[in-house]
């Protein structure tokens, strides 16, 4: 925003504006006039005092005595210039009551108003750092105020040695703060006295003050402008406070007409200050001056909402929302918050129009501003919901705040979304029930539904839809993942159909950041605790399982209860975190809580097989539903009374494992099978079925390896990369690898292992692509680790032979520089950590000596830098689109070996830690 520098009232100062280009006042040191040594022609060598820097802003008794001697050095009689030293000292004297101080100066004002006004104006000048000061003649010559101020300013600030930045209204010293506070309170007492004693005296004081201070607010010198604006704001606060007190008295006294007349005068003065100073300086180029103005407006609004809340104030508050200074945006929001509940009746329509106009800007602040401002904006939005309806675009933006780091912000957001959901339901019912009741409409459906059930389904689906929009927007902004966006007139619609947002890439992005997962968990907890609609795991599951809709009936009243694909997949994430929360609660003591947790876990066991069956086509939903199973305790999972549900669950997970092509789901299903295999309570038929899964996978893989080798030998030139046969082989290798990684250490070496190892070694000796070679080596390596557990080392030579062949054939490939490094380093670390008795040959030891390993590590780090350079150019991909093989290999690398998929390849400690954990776990 570009701010207006000067108002029309400062046109007489145009001749000195050009001097600002050569003197930047905020970058030069200014030392204010000393309270001890004041001279019109102050020498640079004379002692000067900074506010709150080198010396304390106070005078000892000796210094007061020296003041008499100092005044003799002045070039002009003290009758002509009045330095407000006594005024400063009395303001500093905290032992002197303000009432006594105001009474003292009130008596002076009555006896000689000219001298008091001279002291008051000189106080404003010295507070600005000006010297020399003005005389009695200058004060009374109102018509020459602009020229007089111009001369004083030029004399004070012409030389850099006479310019400073630490002055009364910016100093943080204790003395300066005392003067500022007591001066403001002094004004309240003084103005009250002069008007109560004689209104004419008050008007005379205010007219002279306004003539000088108003002109000072248009000075081209920031120090003067800031001080004068602050004094005007102080006077305005005083007037508001006095009017506030008079309003209370007017209800308790018979002199109502007199008080009303006095109140009317004060109100006119307040509006005069607003129009002449605040509404002009609120657009000043200096943020400090704008802050003073907007703070004063907020303070005065609270004191006199009836008189001050008007269109001008509302309009300027709206402009403040786009100010570059965060404090101004924050205070402007507070003003809007206050006026939304205190606006006069005559301005209600204008306020509603204003809130509707600036609602988008407010919700943008909720989402994108700094933390302290966002908190105020969200509270303001809560008030907005009482006055206006936020449109779809605003709700989409504010819904992202449910994933804010501050709990209070999440609570405010949830209140806004729940209020919007209730409003949406009310509007829908009003539109549908214009001619017929809702209960009759529901009875017309194919399967009738109660009004209460319809309301619950409608609101749950509507709220989950809003939360999903917010989650998608927040997730995209907080990660490197890029999704297409379509702009609509009233809302942003983010394409979230299958294979777009919620896909395998989404799961990869979702799992790789522990900090973000923790924030999602906290946000889901806020959703659960602040919404009665989503407080039950079973109720949300019923929404997903409800299938009594007629999809062909586009006019059905139940259509808003049908969850979209995106809502279903987001709901699966929510149910996973809900299940985690239930699991954590089970560890807390308390019989009542324990019964509640058991009931919810039983509901999970009953509903999860149905959810997996209905949504098995969605990899994301299946992934999170299976993760929910991990939160069901073994003692419940294997109970005989739930054997039927458990058998259905096992069957559904097995079907997903057999049909899926997504690596994440293969790994998750394999972990489930491993959990069953290591538990002695599981029935024999289940264990036998798991054993058959391993044998079936091994047999199928062996057949595919045979067919691939035969096909390769027939057509040596064709590498078969990219065709269906190669893709099917890689899928089979990955599926067996996922299962073997979890199960192979529980099994003894059998014939299938030996047959597979021979075929895999043969694959590596052929001219195959890097993905096939990588997948083959990975499976062979898993068999090798299983073999090392029994210290048989049957596969050691086979693996080393295959690894060396792969290195020779792919010496400069991504595979050689990354995978060989990992496998060899794992063997090296594993043999050191677990005392594996492996008879390595001389060539093997040479391949695995420390120098060779360090060289490979450096190569790996170099590739890591290449990865970072590529990913920085296009954050949607880990590698550029044309490097498809490298991208796939890189992703497989982290999915297979890195703990928590922690993608920081430049950190060697992550690599070593992951390898060490893998070796320890599988040994």
UniProtKB/Swiss-Prot annotation:
<dbReference type="GO" id="GO:0031619">
    <property type="term" value="P:homologous chromosome orientation in meiotic metaphase I"/>
</dbReference>
<keyword id="KW-0469">Meiosis</keyword>
<dbReference type="InterPro" id="IPR020839">
    <property type="entry name" value="SCD"/>
</dbReference>
<dbReference type="GO" id="GO:0000793">
    <property type="term" value="C:condensed chromosome"/>
</dbReference>
<dbReference type="GO" id="GO:0030893">
    <property type="term" value="C:meiotic cohesin complex"/>
</dbReference>
<dbReference type="Pfam" id="PF08514">
    <property type="entry name" value="STAG"/>
</dbReference>
<dbReference type="InterPro" id="IPR011989">
    <property type="entry name" value="ARM-like"/>
</dbReference>
<dbReference type="InterPro" id="IPR013721">
    <property type="entry name" value="STAG"/>
</dbReference>
<dbReference type="GO" id="GO:0007062">
    <property type="term" value="P:sister chromatid cohesion"/>
</dbReference>
<protein>
    <recommendedName>
        <fullName>Meiotic recombination protein rec11</fullName>
    </recommendedName>
</protein>
<dbReference type="GO" id="GO:0000785">
    <property type="term" value="C:chromatin"/>
</dbReference>
<feature type="domain" description="SCD">
    <location>
        <begin position="278"/>
        <end position="365"/>
    </location>
</feature>
<dbReference type="GO" id="GO:0005634">
    <property type="term" value="C:nucleus"/>
</dbReference>
<dbReference type="InterPro" id="IPR016024">
    <property type="entry name" value="ARM-type_fold"/>
</dbReference>
<dbReference type="InterPro" id="IPR039662">
    <property type="entry name" value="Cohesin_Scc3/SA"/>
</dbReference>
<dbReference type="GO" id="GO:0051177">
    <property type="term" value="P:meiotic sister chromatid cohesion"/>
</dbReference>
<dbReference type="Pfam" id="PF21581">
    <property type="entry name" value="SCD"/>
</dbReference>
<dbReference type="GO" id="GO:0008278">
    <property type="term" value="C:cohesin complex"/>
</dbReference>
<dbReference type="GO" id="GO:0010789">
    <property type="term" value="P:meiotic sister chromatid cohesion involved in meiosis I"/>
</dbReference>
<dbReference type="GO" id="GO:0003682">
    <property type="term" value="F:chromatin binding"/>
</dbReference>
<dbReference type="GO" id="GO:0030999">
    <property type="term" value="P:linear element assembly"/>
</dbReference>
